[in-house]
Design a protein with these regions (language model features):
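Boundary at the C-terminal end of the N-terminal hydrophobic targeting segment
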Residues: 24-31
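N-terminal export leaders
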Residues: 9-13
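Acidic/His-rich structured neighborhood in mature extracellular/periplasmic domains
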Residues: 73-214, 261, 267-270
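N-terminal secretory signal peptides that target proteins for export/translocation
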Residues: 1-8
Length: 303
């Protein structure tokens, strides 16, 4: 039997899974490859609370809107590996009850984009579509773990290419570093999908080799005080750190200019620090707190 194409395979699965899971989550089952709604969407009460405030944010510029939503998430507990929701199936998902550094900025941005839709479409289904747009290569989840953008620098390149964000890193004085891009291959036991699917390891290694073959451009932290005036509320700030003689992306958050005029770093801070989403100190000061932090990437949401 000839191999099914992706489009054929998805069409077949959509028909079958709609029948199997319609009672659990009408209208969502096909898009989420048969995973139950309560697996892919956690924290409905928090989502509804955000929707109730959406009218006051919807007319803000996308960056300010993203940061305003991020500000409402301050205090949310830090929780890692929230995207590892199944042994085999990859699907767009969210957990509003616990966020890591990546899902914090991602949830804030996806919700901000959802507010561009008519109000009757401010739904979990629409929100998950915005997550898919941002999280997956080319904006499409295929049901495969490999369709997710796992490295921030690849995410930035892909989203910049599609006109969703603007990569400001080089024009703000970046320098190239040798990209390490090896975390997943080295630490594969920490990833549920990779533990249960050993055959993924070779493909992940190929992906890391591709990402790592390109220089990682970053703005040295010594230059950050001089560019803070050029950064805007809602800019996505990726942290680059030393990895031996190489450099890798290690953390991410949002820029937010507070009422005192200071450009601060808003992020989901790990349990060894605050263990929750916080508005931290001035961005340049935050970088100087950690000797291993080398500098930053900057992406500006466009739509």
């Amino acid at each position: 039997m000839p191999a099914l194409t992706v489009s054929t395979r998805r069409s077949f699965c959509s028909v079958l899974l709609l029948a199997l899971f319609a009672t659990a989550a009408p209208g969502i089952a096909a898009e989420n490859f048969g995973l139950p709604f309560d697996t892919v969407f956690k924290g409905r009460e928090r989502f509804n609370a955000l929707v109730a405030q959406g009218d006051k944010w919807k007319n803000l510029p996308i960056g300010e809107r993203t940061a305003a939503i991020g500000r409402t998430l301050v205090g949310t507990p830090y929780k890692s590996y929230t995207l590892e929701i199944d042994d085999r199936i990859e699907a767009p998902s969210v957990n509003f009850n616990g966020l890591d550094c990546w899902t914090f900025f991602e949830v804030s941005l996806a919700f901000a984009r959802m507010l561009d839709e008519p109000r009757d479409q401010w739904t979990p289904q629409t929100f998950l579509k915005k997550i898919e747009l941002d999280r997956y290569r080319g904006g499409e989840c295929t049901g495969s773990y490999l369709s997710r953008l796992h490295y921030l620098e690849e995410w930035l390149s892909d989203n910049d290419r599609r006109g969703l964000v603007r990569d400001l890193t080089r024009e703000l004085g970046a320098i190239p570093g040798k990209n390490s891009a090896r975390e997943m291959t080295v630490g594969w036991r920490g990833y549920r999908y990779m533990r249960h699917n050993p055959d993924l390891r070779a493909s992940i290694a190929q992906m890391e080799a591709r990402v790592g073959s390109k220089p990682l451009y970053y703005i040295p932290k010594s230059k950050v005080p001089g560019i803070e005036g050029k950064l805007q509320t809602g800019d996505i700030i990726g942290i680059c750190s030393r990895d031996g003689k190489m450099v890798g992306t290690s953390h991410v958050g949002l820029a937010i200019r507070t009422n005192d005029g200071v450009l601060r770093f808003m992020h989901a801070s790990s349990p060894r620090n605050f263990g929750k989403v916080v508005i931290d100190q001035r961005l340049s000061g935050y970088l100087n707190e950690f000797s291993g932090h080398l500098g930053i990437l900057v992406a500006r949401p466009l739509k």
